[in-house]
């Protein structure tokens, strides 16, 4: 049986958030955690920063746009995530049918029938082939030729549909704004999927456990958006292959518990962005955020506030202040001097990342 502190430290270490664990590049961060939640582009960049060693915003842009080693798209739960580029196609093939099925009622409400969605896919493909990269506004303007009103949510759902069907993905930023490109142009296909069927299901479950364990199959289902029956099958296949071990109702990759280092004299303080994987990668919250303070992290309305953790335990929320170099930290209680020093250092690091001097 693992106690709460051991579970928390193992999870934080898996996420490169404790015991001094940090990666050296944006690509290795994303490979380690498999997916960074990315509906907010700045929060996604901060999610890479907090797991890295001196990674700059410029280095992250290079990984996205020059190296093309990471890519942003609609994956887990149909939400924007950043994942390794060479995983984009097989993950999309596994997840997109469920996402499209779950969106069918919304398509009906917006009057987007199968024929119209297919015509929109073709129009978007032609537009990007001839004129890409294009912004959402530029694609929306072209969709009006199909009778799609430019206001409302229909353009977004059609652009997202084109992503889920493998037409497009996010491309380079233009003046800080996202653009879209043809997936096959931006990330040329190798001609085959790395994993398919059950092998894809077990691989995405294994990646989840590598980045989140100790966890349950219900945690995996909540994170991925896949049915619990699928998660149960993934667990069964992983168990049959000897990949996982059970510890009192929690699952680990075999051998991972032995990797937990002893406690450090210096607290490892990290400033997580809004919507960070460490906070939302599980069905329940009590391991990382004390119950008394959960409403401060999850205030309602779908918001998840930026949070300060020390050795994996939430101790405060934070926000950007009115000044260009201002960070406000709101602690849940008295902060020991040793932890406060680490908080101050982390604040300075976030400011440097957001407002580089050169």
Residue ranges and their predicted role:
Residues 65-75, 79, 164-173, 239-247, ...:
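A short, conserved structural fragment
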Residues 83-88, 174-194, 250-263:
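Short, cationic-aromatic polyanion-contact patches
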Residues 237, 241-292:
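Non-catalytic regulatory appendages
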Residues 152-233:
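Loop-centered beta-sheet repeat module
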């Amino acid at each position: 049986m693992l106690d709460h502190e051991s579970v928390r430290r193992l999870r934080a270490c898996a996420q490169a958030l404790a015991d001094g664990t940090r990666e050296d590049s944006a690509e290795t961060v994303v490979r380690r955690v498999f997916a960074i939640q990315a509906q907010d582009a700045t929060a996604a960049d901060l999610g890479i920063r907090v797991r890295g060693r001196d990674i700059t915003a410029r280095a992250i842009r290079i990984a996205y746009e020059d190296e093309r080693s990471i890519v942003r798209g609609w994956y887990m739960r149909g939400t924007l995530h950043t994942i390794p580029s060479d995983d984009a196609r097989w993950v999309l093939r596994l997840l997109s049918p469920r996402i499209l099925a779950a969106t069918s009622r919304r398509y009906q409400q917006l009057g987007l029938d199968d024929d119209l969605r297919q015509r929109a896919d073709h129009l978007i493909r032609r537009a990007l082939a001839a004129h890409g990269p294009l912004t959402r506004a530029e694609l929306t303007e072209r969709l009006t030729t199909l009778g799609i009103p430019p206001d409302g949510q229909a353009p977004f759902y059609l652009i997202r549909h084109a992503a889920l069907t493998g037409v497009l993905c996010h491309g380079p930023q233009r003046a800080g704004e996202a653009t879209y490109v043809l997936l096959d142009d931006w990330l040329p296909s190798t001609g085959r999927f790395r994993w398919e069927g059950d092998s894809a299901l077990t691989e995405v479950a294994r990646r989840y456990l590598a980045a989140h364990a100790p966890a349950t199959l219900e945690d995996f289902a909540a994170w991925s958006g896949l049915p619990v029956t699928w998660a149960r099958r993934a667990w069964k296949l992983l168990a049959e292959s000897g990949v996982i071990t059970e510890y009192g109702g929690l699952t680990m990759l075999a051998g991972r518990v032995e990797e937990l280092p002893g406690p450090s004299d210096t607290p490892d303080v990290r400033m997580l962005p809004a919507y960070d994987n460490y906070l939302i990668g599980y069905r329940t919250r009590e391991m990382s955020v004390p119950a008394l303070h959960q409403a401060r992290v999850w205030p309602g309305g779908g918001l998840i506030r930026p949070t300060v953790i020390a050795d994996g335990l939430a101790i405060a929320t934070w926000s950007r202040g009115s000044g260009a170099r201002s960070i406000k930290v709101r602690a849940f209680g008295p902060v020991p001097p040793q932890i406060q020093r680490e908080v101050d250092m982390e604040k300075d690091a976030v400011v440097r990342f957001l407002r580089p001097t050169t």
